[in-house]
């Protein structure tokens, strides 16, 4: 029982912004409750925003199935409980090493978790998320 397995979950991202780019988002973590984590991601809403030429991704999960510290034993991301409906926005993710010479996204692209953004950049980012979701995140 208590044995945790290393699991990689892949989520295909299509139509990033206004083009036909396709990428594969890879989420790797140690968990002993992979079914719950998979279900949470299957029901997640994924939004992308381009900021200063970098593509950032928010994976938004329902509060009912959102992984917490009891599910995600070891990972490179945290949850940010800022949605008014009680859901969670997962930490910023930056796609790297994804561009091919033909301009399309590489299916084998890597992800890295972003460093903390400056307050001004974060404010700009959150305003874009707020507009995208129709939420007032400042209230």
Curated annotation (Swiss-Prot):
Motif window: DLNP: 136-139
A GO cellular component entry from the record: host cell nucleus
Protein's cellular compartments: Host cytoplasm; Host mitochondrion; Host nucleus
Record bears the keyword Repeat: no
Keyword hit for Lipoprotein: no
InterPro entries (UniProt xref): Pneumo_NS1
Keyword terms, alphabetized: Host cytoplasm, Host mitochondrion, Host nucleus, Host-virus interaction, Inhibition of host adaptive immune response by virus, Inhibition of host innate immune response by virus, Inhibition of host interferon signaling pathway by virus, Inhibition of host IRF3 by virus, Inhibition of host IRF7 by virus, Inhibition of host MAVS by virus, Inhibition of host RIG-I by virus, Inhibition of host RLR pathway by virus, Inhibition of host STAT2 by virus, Inhibition of host TBK1 by virus, Inhibition of host TLR pathway by virus, Interferon antiviral system evasion, Modulation of host cell apoptosis by virus, Viral immunoevasion
Highest taxon in the source lineage: Viruses
GO biological process, one term: symbiont-mediated perturbation of host apoptosis
Family indicated by similarity: Belongs to the pneumovirus non-structural protein 1 family.
Subunit structure: Monomer. Homomultimer. Heteromultimer with NS2. Interacts with the matrix protein M. Interacts with host ELOC and CUL2; this interaction allows NS1 to form an active E3 ligase with ELOC and CUL2. Interacts with host IRF3; this interaction leads to the disrupted association of IRF3 with CREBBP and thus reduced binding of IRF3 to the IFN-beta promoter. Interacts with host MAVS; this interaction prevents MAVS binding to RIGI and inhibits signaling pathway leading to interferon production. Interacts with host MAP1B/microtubule-associated protein 1B.
General function of this protein: Plays a major role in antagonizing the type I IFN-mediated antiviral response by degrading or inhibiting multiple cellular factors required for either IFN induction or response pathways. Acts cooperatively with NS2 to repress activation and nuclear translocation of host IFN-regulatory factor IRF3. Also disrupts the association of IRF3 with CREBBP. Interacts with host mitochondrial-associated membrane (MAM) MAVS and prevents the interaction with RIGI. Interacts with TRIM25 to suppress TRIM25-mediated RIGI ubiquitination and thereby RIGI-MAVS interaction.
The protein's name: Non-structural protein 1
Encoding gene per record: 1C
């Amino acid at each position: 029982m208590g044995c945790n397995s290393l699991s990689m979950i892949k989520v295909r991202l299509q139509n990033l912004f206004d083009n036909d780019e396709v990428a594969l988002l890879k989420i790797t973590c140690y968990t002993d409750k992979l079914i719950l984590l998979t279900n949470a991601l299957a029901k997640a809403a994924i939004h992308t925003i381009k900021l200063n030429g970098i593509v950032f991704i928010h994976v938004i999960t329902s509060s009912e199935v959102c992984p917490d510290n009891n599910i995600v034993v070891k990972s490179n991301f945290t949850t940010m409980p800022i949605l008014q409906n009680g859901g969670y926005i997962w930490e910023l993710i930056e796609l790297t090493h994804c561009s091919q010479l033909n301009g399309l996204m590489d299916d084998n692209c890597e992800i890295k978790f972003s460093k903390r953004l400056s307050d001004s950049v974060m404010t700009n980012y959150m305003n874009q998320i707020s507009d995208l979701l129709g939420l007032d995140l400042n209230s």
